[in-house]
Design a protein with these regions (language model features):
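Long, hydrophobic N-terminal alpha-helical segment
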Residues: 25-30, 34-46, 56-58, 73
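Outer-envelope beta-barrel architecture signal
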Residues: 21-27, 39, 47-53, 95-101, ...
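Residues on the lipid-exposed face of transmembrane beta-strands in outer-membrane beta-barrel proteins
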Residues: 41-45, 85-89, 103-105, 138-146, ...
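A contiguous binding-surface segment within folded domains or other stable secondary-structure elements
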Residues: 89, 94-146
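Bacterial Sec-dependent N-terminal signal peptides
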Residues: 1-23, 235-239
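Extracellular/periplasm-exposed beta-strand and loop segments of Gram-negative cell-envelope proteins
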Residues: 29-30, 57-84, 110-135, 163-226, ...
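Outer-membrane beta-barrel biogenesis signature
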Residues: 15-28, 214-218
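Transmembrane beta-strands of outer-membrane beta-barrel proteins
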Residues: 26-32, 56-58, 99-106, 157-159
């Protein structure tokens, strides 16, 4: 995590020290990040009339959501760290407003944990689950930015296809008791984890799944290419 933060700070330092154009920097906030476990803050430097550099950092904060697992409700807490840097080109005549295209690079870490409540062969199971996702990605964002009274920015991320090199793994251990699983319980645990993963469309057919019967644990792992899509909105203030 330290290297992306350092890169983020170095870029900001470079821009503030070398910009000749009256930049009018914009400070932005993307509220949707709160639902995923991050405070997403950004800045845009309009270094030429139609050209900007945009930087975002996602600061991890805890977010809890309820998921369905084995026909029961379970809570999962997640946190996200992210860094994004993009070069934005506006199509219209006004600076920092109108339609734009923005190639970007990003780094993202997503961590989640929680207890999945269920049953294995009619016995109570409590799956202590941890997931870890890390990815480097690149994409192109198409969007539209409104500039109200030359100060308030409303930025809409309309279409943003991206490509990622990712690593994902998870570990789910039954902590209900210390008795080893039977073969039937092992098979049921694997099936239940597969069903839970099916809610993640881009991962469900790619994961390698293994079961350690004596440790009462299900492992999943994936390394490789993953497609992605960026959309959303932010609100900002232009200085």
């Amino acid at each position: 995590m330290k290297n992306p933060i350092l890169l983020f700070l170095l870029i900001i330092s470079y821009l503030t020290g070398h910009t000749q154009y009256d930049a009018h920097p914009v400070i932005k906030w993307a509220p949707a990040g709160l639902a995923f476990g991050k405070l997403s803050l950004g800045t845009e430097y309009n270094f030429k009339k139609k050209n900007s550099i945009e930087l975002y950092i996602g600061i991890p904060i805890a977010a809890t959501r309820t998921i369905d697992y084995d026909n029961k409700q379970s809570d999962i807490e997640s946190k996200v760290f992210s860094v994004l840097a993009g070069y934005r080109r506006y199509i219209g005549k006004k600076p920092a407003a109108g339609f734009y295209a923005e190639p970007y690079f990003k780094y993202l870490e997503h961590h989640a944990q929680g207890i999945l409540e269920g049953d294995l062969d009619s016995k109570v199971a409590r799956m202590d689950t941890k997931t870890d996702y890390k990815a480097w990605g690149a994409g192109i964002q198409l969007g539209y930015q409104f500039l109200i009274a030359k100060r308030i920015c409303l930025d809409f991320f309309l279409i943003g296809p991206e490509a990622n090199i990712a690593r994902f793994n998870s570990q789910s251990t039954d902590i209900a008791n210390s008795i080893p699983w039977t073969l039937i319980q092992s098979a049921e645990a694997e099936r239940q984890i597969k069903d839970a993963i099916s809610d993640i469309p881009i991962l469900k057919d790619k994961l390698e799944i293994s079961v350690d019967q004596s440790k009462k644990t299900v492992y999943t792992e994936y390394r490789g290419f993953l497609p992605g899509f960026r959309l959303g909105a932010s609100i900002g203030f232009r200085f």
